[in-house]
Amino acid sequence: MKVFDYEDVQLIPNKCIVNSRSECDTTVILGKHAFKMPIVPANMQTIINESIAEFLAENGYFYIMHRFNGSARIPFVKKMKERQLISSISVGVKKEECLFVEELAKQGLTPDYITIDIAHGHSNSVIEMIQRIKTRLPETFVIAGNVGTPEAVRELENAGADATKVGIGPGKVCITKIKTGFGTGGWQLAALRWCAKAARKPIIADGGIRTHGDIAKSIRFGATMVMIGSLFAGHEESSGETKIENGIAYKEYFGSASEFQKGEKKNIEGKKIWIQHKGSLKNTLIEMHQDLQSSISYAGGRDLEAIRKVDYVIVKNSIFNGDTI
């Protein structure tokens, strides 16, 4: 197997067939819905909140609400249903999450999307949760993860998952690769390619995205959707503390397995960093959209399918993907 990551690969351009990059269509379909771009902000507390989720849904973007305020999920789903917006939430696998799924079914609430979100998704507990959701809420589109092998993808698909999330520890505030010795950090793009070859259903690439060009690379190597954390951190709308240093504003960004999220120093696989304030989320989304349109034009097509067919070169290798602990 070839081992490489985002910074090791360059895509090779094809003849441009559009008069303007603005003609290029970045639309993607996931389940029963079409979205403006194949991107989704990470379901982390410093990346997504209810107001951001509503903004994204109103404007045709996919989102996944985090699971770290469990009691707010049912009111959130009700609110999104009332507003006729897409409802997309996360669950874990503990006993209280099983009860939560039962409560959704009891109230007749069917979220459009449920993401089963744990660090090591190739597990019996995730398989059982997939089956539970599919039994109680059969119309819900189930995303399961995170995984890093073809075996895991096929097993979760066979259990009933409608999509799998690929990536074990490549994120900017994840230190799984250093703390445990396991994961896809440093070879996330190759892991995506490996998993995509086995997949029969959509894959969401999760982690390791450092530039907008990495979105196109993810599409090339098999992703239907790309989950992004650090590029969506530090915005005006983002949750988390703000601090000023030497006249420059910074916002906190921490991992879901960090002590800042857990509230205790136990089984820590995440850290906190401070991101320079980036201004409005809307502006970042516009720039991301324009850059992806440019990627399509370089691929020689009019839509995302063109990116899947381009050739590529491997230019170097860097095991830590630019990160330090």
UniProtKB/Swiss-Prot annotation:
Family matches, as Pfam families: IMPDH
Classification via Gene3D superfamilies: Aldolase class I (3.20.20.70)
Family of this protein: Belongs to the IMPDH/GMPR family. GuaC type 2 subfamily.
InterPro entries per record: Aldolase_TIM, GMP_reductase, GuaC_type_2, IMP_DH/GMP_Rdtase_CS, IMP_DH_GMPRt
GO CC annotation: cytosol; GMP reductase complex
Role noted for this protein: Catalyzes the irreversible NADPH-dependent deamination of GMP to IMP. It functions in the conversion of nucleobase, nucleoside and nucleotide derivatives of G to A nucleotides, and in maintaining the intracellular balance of A and G nucleotides.
Protein name listed in UniProt: GMP reductase
Signal sequence extent: none
HAMAP family: GMP_reduct_type2 (MF_01511)
GO molecular function: GMP reductase activity
Residues given in the record as NADP(+) binding sites: 203-226
Biological process terms in GO annotation: purine nucleotide metabolic process
Keyword Amino-acid biosynthesis among UniProt keywords: no
Protein's UniProt keywords contain Oxidoreductase: yes
